[in-house]
Every structure is written in structure tokens, then in C-alpha cells.
Amino acid sequence: MKKTNIFNKVILISIFAALCCAGTFVQIRMPAGDFVHLGNFVMIVAALLLGGISGGLVGSLGMGLYDLIFYFDKPSTILRTFILKFIVGFIVGFLFRLIIKKKVNASLWLYILGGLFGVLFTVSLIFFILGSKADFNITSGFNSIYKAHIFGKTTNIKISLYVPIFSILFTAFAIAGGIFSYRLTERQRAVLLSVMVAIFVNILGEFILRWILEGLLVSDFRTSIVVATSKIPGSIITGFISIVLSVFVYEPVYRAVKDSPAFYDDIVYETESNQKEELLHE
């Protein structure tokens, strides 16, 4: 039985990894060179259904394969994807199960998370305003990025207007999730909280790893911070789309597959059994 479950899990990881890679091909290009895609969304659904380690493998293998195909000459990009996507997928699956098992107050934490995104909005807006007088622009238009002074060097940036716009959308979404959480099922609240935390980690991780790996392997650190900042809008928009789709797609998918032995999950199954017993005793 155990060997069968492991075999089923390997097959499902392979299928979801292929879908994740395919989802990364569904993309909208951003002016700064990055793109919005559906790879993260597939990884999140896999993590919610299969668990943290499996979800991490799906993201790492699926989006890592895409990078191997198109960025084989950029080791920093491939390494960043393999590391970060595993971490993000693991966080989604682990937090989701922890929230359900421990009956965490998701509404309270959604308010707290909304506050964190509010800080991100404020900081990014300050950068945008302060950078408006910079005299050298790297990309132009609505997604313009400008040089400025950081650490005493001429490497300042005017953050894209996309960053504060989508940061405030994240803030509103998190707070609205807390306010209207009574309309969501317990699972939907758990999905919303776990995915928002993971996306926050993904945005921060994308910036830090791009800055460090690009600085170590490709260019200097001053140039790499400009490159890392220019990619933030794509990460934010992709994350926002992933959150919205995950909240509304997971529940019907879960109901369709929850009785299948291939998707058996000890923690979730035992939690549901305990809830049924509590209802019977009442």
C-alpha cells in the first residue's frame, strides 16, 4: 500500500510539473523584460493537494525545466528558480496543513498580512516619488525604472508604478479576505492565508536572489539591484493572479479528487474525520 501511494505521488508530481512548465509558457510580457505567467498557480494547486515537499518539487522541476530550455546560458536564473520555487511550494503546502490542523485564526493573520503589504505599498510609493527626478531612465513609460543613488553610488532606481499599484491591491485583498472571511469556507481561508504568505516570500526571494546571484555570477551588485528591481512588477502581478485563481479553483478541484486514494493526505483526512466526530457528538 505504501509503495502504491509513493508511486501515485511520483506520477502526480510528474503530471503537475509538466502542467507547471506548460503554464509558464502562458505569459504576458512586461516592458522591463519580465513576464506574467501561470506556472506559480499550477505549483500552488499541486502544493495544496499533494503537500509541501511535492508542491516544491512541482514548482522547482516545472519552472526549472522552462528555464533550462530558454535560459540554459544563464546559470543564475536556473539556480534561482530551482531554489526559490521549491521554497515557495513547500511553504504553501506546509502552512495550509498547519492552519487546518491547528485551527489557526486565518482572519486575524489576513489583517496582519494586509498591514505588511501596506508597508510594501508605502515604501514602494516613496521610492517611486523620490526617483521621479532621476535623470537617467532604463525603461520608459508606465513601467519606467530610473537610476539614482544607493549606498552612495549612482545606482538609484525609480520603482515601476506597477509596484505601488499592485501592492495596494494586495493590501486590499488581504484585508477584504479578513473582513469577508465568514463567507469563505475554512479551506478557502486557509488557502488564502497560506498562498498570500508564500507569494510574499516569492516576491522578496525573487528580488534578493536576483540581486545576489546576478551580482555574483553575471554583473556587479550595483547593476544587479537595478535588474532585480525592474523584475518586481512581473512577480507582483503573477502573485496576485495566482492568489485569486487559487482561492476559487482549489475548492472544486479538492471536492472532485478528495476521495481518490492517489490524493490521500493523512493530516487533512484526520482533521476532517475529527470534525465529523465532533458534529456527531454535538
Predicted regions and their residues:
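Loop-helix junctions at membrane interfaces
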Residues: 1-282
